[in-house]
Amino acid sequence: MLYICIPNNVWYIMSKKILLSSKEIHIILHRLACQLIENHTDFENTVLIGIQPRGTYLAERLVSILENDYQIPSVKLGLLDITFYRDDFRRRDTPLEANKTNINFIVEDKKVVFIDDVLFSGRSIRAALTAIQSFGRPSEIELLVLIDRRFSRHLPIQPNYRGSQVDVFDEEKVSVHWQERDGKDAVYIVNK
């Protein structure tokens, strides 16, 4: 348990439960890579798009696995910032910080696989669907997520590929930690 003090000396107890360990994430990433290979074979007509900010770690890791462990050469990877396409970006008290979009290929008539860490309400994916149209009209769009919070949807969006499904209360948050950013791979359920 973690105790947090906020102003006026009010203490809150924050609990953190591990959902996936580093080893479990490793196994899931290889399974997801194999599922992508089954459906996209050589990736000749497929591009992967990591949704900024946290989906990029998952996307980069999957590309590394595809290229290094399964010898799929030159998998096309783009990074998509959806900040100004979100339907809630003007409703926040603090301004949102935009990330970088880096898509240096044409998505016209390509199969696009959106990649994000957690599917929650579906609003990020709706924003990504709008944002990708600036880069062309894909022939097909699929969704890959590490964690699917299945009973939390606000929009009718479902993943084509999921690492794990979890049912958590609304007051709980799924927190994905990546080695590259957080020092280790793990997924936690945290009480807000």
Give the location of each predicted region.
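Alpha-helical structural signal in soluble globular domains
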Residues: 33, 61-69, 131
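Short, glycine/charge-rich flexible loops or terminal/linker lids adjacent to PRPP-binding catalytic cores
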Residues: 72-112
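Charged, well-structured alpha/beta interaction segments
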Residues: 43-64, 122
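PRPP-dependent phosphoribosyltransferase catalytic core
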Residues: 130-192
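Active-site-facing substrate-recognition patch
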Residues: 11-45
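Internal catalytic-core helix/loop-beta-alpha segment
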Residues: 103-133
